Amino acid sequence: MQPIMPAVGGGRQRLLGLYHALGEDIQATYIGSYDWPGELFRDQQLSPGLREIIVPLTVAHHEAARAAAESVEGRVVIDCMFSRQAHLSPEYLRVAREYMAHADVVVFSHPWAFPPLEADLKPEQLVVYDSQNVESILRTDLHGELASADDVLRVVVADEYALCRRADLILACSHEDREAFARLFKLDIEKMRVVPNGIFAFSHAVPDFESRCQAKSNLGLPGKPVALFVGSNYAPNNDAARFIANDLAKALPSVHFAIVGGCGAALAGMVVPDNVHVLGQLDELIKQQWLTAADVALNPLTQGSGTSIKMFDFMAAGLPVIATGAGARGIIRTGTRAFATVPLARTGAAVESLVTDDEVRRLMGAAGRKLVEDFYAWERISPRAGRLFQAFLRRKLEGVRTFTVLVPSYERPDHLERLFQCLVNQQERDFDVVVIDQSREPWAGRDRDWGFTLTYVHTPVRGAVKARNAGGELATGRIIAFTDDDCEPTPGWLAAARACFQSSSVIGVEGRVESDHMDTPDWRPVSNVGFAGLGFMTANLFAANAAFQHLNGFDLMFDEPHFREDTDFGWRLQELGEVPYCEDALVFHPAHRRDSERESSETRSRFFEKDAILYKKHPARYMTIFHAEGHWHQTEGFWSNFERGAAKYNVDITPLLERFRDVSFGS
């Protein structure tokens, strides 16, 4: 209901960020309007791939919207009632229909325009609902206490339900929203994907040490520790501003606290300490100076919903962030600490510790920047969305495949070539392939005709867990078949797995993995023979697509370095249904020489830090694999790295240490 530009507010920022660069061969046209009167028609190119056309609503439409608002005590409901009032703006509908007629993909960024345009959709068009919220829940929260709003809320729920049922693809901002949609409207989660909000992370470089010192001098704070908070005039932000001024600043007089944005109005009339700088709204240049000068950023919220976008701004600037649980809600956590989460009462101690520890600030700031680049940069989210549209459009036009074979790859082009020859030889032909290649150079075979559909993504984002989740996002087959780039599936691999899925109770399949050099110390064999149902290996694992989406993929805490993510996933998969072991779904995994850096015993033993997370999540099941594998008394370095992981991830392993540590092989 609003124009994209100027991109102020979360909704407009999402429209600009998400659609500005879907792909070199994808042109997006946004048809919008103004939710206020008196504006003119507008048509402009916002980026090479995004055009904005804004059609004003009529005077009659605005009068009807005002009447609707009066019926609900003056609350603005022009968006909620659009489907019932759109006929009053025929020019908007005409322009929308004109551009819809030539589109392959039609996206509704809210449910409001869907009902009046539903009849104009073509059967072959991909229909997408880009949900910025679960509107049925949000609007009920906003207006549910008003009896006079019942009719408005019925319209909202009816419109959103109709769009969700018609959509071929639903984009949700979070996994929690995805689950809410599935639960509320009884939807197939297989057609839903999480596409988060973000920021333009690459628009500013991370300041170096000299730049930070210069910025402090420019602001009159040379050599002083600076903590920064940014917030609009919104109740949770206002509470945070008062907490900083009344509590933190008084407890830490040597630290200067900068409060930026409309939340500063909450401090009007108060006498604040000298080390509090209430700055109000700043232009972008001055705001960047404070981001550069700060040593630490704060987000001490105690309430709120959704993701706090300011966290991404802080991390993109390379700032270490101290947040409460509410302040960090919904943000991905990997195996590297990208921000600190503390209770409100411990915020002061965390600030005091962080401003005096240059190395921790440097490491956390770098990790936060990397997190934003990997997951929350519009520059990467937009092409991801474009690939999603292409994958689901192909699914709609060509039909749903039985399998999507998912392959992460990193610097093994020759192995990848051998794997593809094995896929060419598969007896089962109803499959497509997704490769997420994190190598420095693209794979030479990416454009070859292999006899099956290949989606190839070359990405600078590193990490096997990230790669598998990225591939799972693009997977449109009913079953996702996981294997590795150095594996060699036998010709009957997919066919054998398909037979297992004939049972409706089967949600996944664990295939047999054989290796060579099984008893040679200079080699690391990879096999699950004799370990059925215990560890699981993504070298040969199948999962129903719906189950993968329901589980939100692999847990990224097992990344950096990646280890045990497949075990955790397999165990969670078993909670949804049966995951039998299939001898005939066979993959050969060549052993790796120990003299390479990636495969050395010292390098591999460091991965046992992830056992701490596995133990924390699945304490009873962990003990089964603990004893079956026997690393605790056979593998040098197990205990030292397990203990390191326990400290790193805050896991209490005292019972294991007391019972097993002294009788083990050693650390």
Q: What do these predicted regions represent?
A:
Residues R394-N425:
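N-proximal low-complexity "stem/linker" segments adjacent to membrane-targeting elements
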Residues I480:
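Short aromatic/hydrophobic "clamp" motif used to bind/position activated sugar donors
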Residues R14, P196-V272, V278-Q288, T292:
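Conserved catalytic-core segment of nucleotide-activated headgroup transferases in glycan assembly
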Residues T459-A475:
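Glycine-rich, basic loop-to-helix element that forms the pyrophosphate-binding segment
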Residues E488, G492-P521, P590:
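Conserved donor NDP-sugar-binding/catalytic core segment of glycosyltransferases
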Residues F420-H458:
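Acidic donor-binding segment of Leloir-type glycosyltransferases
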